[in-house]
């Protein structure tokens, strides 16, 4: 065999020989999923949670079925299921007194309600706003979800007079 042919044979053998640290032709695959939604979620605040005039040392409760309950209208994709979650304050701050004047606020396991498609709290489903819940938008003609929240304020006997405020944040995301 000629020397050139032998060099080519050795070169081919070196190229085809497995090498340490290099992949040996293993392949894999994954599936791809995409869930396209037809509509973004829009939240409209309809009413603030309002306790009205509160007496020092006397706790006051507003039920989610009461006229002073906080209320939202949520619009989204027809019949879509969602997760409803709240970020709740532990206290309300007096905006007229010296800094540090606060009043506790609490929420029970039945302080919130939701209703599919209908703005009627009497037929709404109660849930714990601390834990959140799942809900569902209405059918094509009425793709809405309505939310209500109540709570209890507990002013101390030494509470400073003034207006106490806080914020309740509601989050709604598709499942």
Identify the role of each PLM range:
Residues 8-17:
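Bacterial N-terminal signal peptides
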């Amino acid at each position: 065999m000629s020397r050139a042919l032998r060099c080519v044979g050795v070169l081919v053998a070196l190229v085809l020989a497995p090498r340490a640290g290099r992949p040996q032709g293993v392949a894999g695959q994954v599936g791809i999923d995409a869930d396209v939604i037809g509509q973004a979620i829009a939240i409209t605040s309809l009413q603030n949670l309002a306790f009205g005039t509160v007496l020092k040392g006397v706790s006051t409760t507003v039920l989610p079925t009461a006229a002073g309950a906080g209320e939202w209208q949520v619009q989204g994709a027809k019949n879509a299921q969602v997760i409803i979650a709240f970020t709740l304050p532990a206290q309300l701050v007096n905006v007229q007194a010296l800094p540090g004047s606060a009043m506790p606020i609490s929420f029970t396991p039945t302080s919130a309600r939701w209703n599919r498609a209908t703005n009627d709290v009497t037929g709404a489903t109660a849930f714990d706003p601390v834990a959140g819940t799942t809900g569902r938008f209405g059918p094509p003609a009425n793709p809405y979800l309505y939310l209500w929240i109540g709570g209890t304020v507990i002013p101390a006997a030494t509470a400073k007079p003034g207006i106490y405020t806080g914020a309740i944040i509601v989050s709604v995301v598709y499942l």
